Amino acid sequence: MRVRRFLFIISILFFPLATNAQTPSQPAVVRPDGGTSGRMESIFIPPNAGAPFSLTLVTEWSRPLGNGGTFILTNQRRIVRDSRGRIYQERWILVPKGGDIKSRMDVFQITDPEQHTWYNCETATKVCQLLKYHLTTEDNFQPAIGTSGPLANGKGSRQHEDLGVSSTDGVDTHGYRETVTINPGVMGNDKPMVTTREFWYSPELAINLISIVDAPQSGKQVFTAKDLATLEPEPNLFVVPDEYKIVDKRDE
């Protein structure tokens, strides 16, 4: 709970950094990667139309130990989007890196911006909760690009860096780094607390193909896309299997 509260506060400090281009009729939608809310949030996938892809997302979460070492959890999961903006995502459990425990898929999710539906399906029970999906293909999704300057009331400072252009798994990306420094005493800290967020954004796909979030209380989260393809995926991925029971939760 303390980690979640800390990440919430950090997200508020990062939020003023967003100075993205907007249209008068459609404000920009900005969502940073990382964090936890019962489940690791990972990278944000918007329902952009006309930009299909499939990839495997590799996650590593390093947390500090009291003796100066680190404890690393990892997984790999599949993410797919079609030209209509529908998204299929697998959720695999995080397991110790290099250990004997094998990761497994425990949840898969299917979202449809046209039907405004979100199926959250548990593999153990073969039950899908049908929820409302509020994002649309008309939303103006933009990367969370900020500016440098002091935080309000002398609480610290923020720094924005443009890392230039590169190529990630054969796709052009633009890199950015945001650093927030919290002064001693602001959050019960006796030394400056530094949180960094680096990401490599693909304008073509409107997603981050590499994202690194490093916070003092939650550790370091690294998300890396691999096996990226920009072809139209199989349509059966966006259909709930017959053996799954659907429970409609949209009115709750």
Q: What label would you give each PLM region?
A:
Residues M1-F8:
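Bacterial N-terminal signal peptides that target proteins for export
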Residues T23-E252:
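Extended soluble regions of mature proteins
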Residues F8-P16:
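Bacterial N-terminal signal peptides
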Residues L17-A21:
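Sec/Tat signal peptide C-region and signal peptidase I cleavage site
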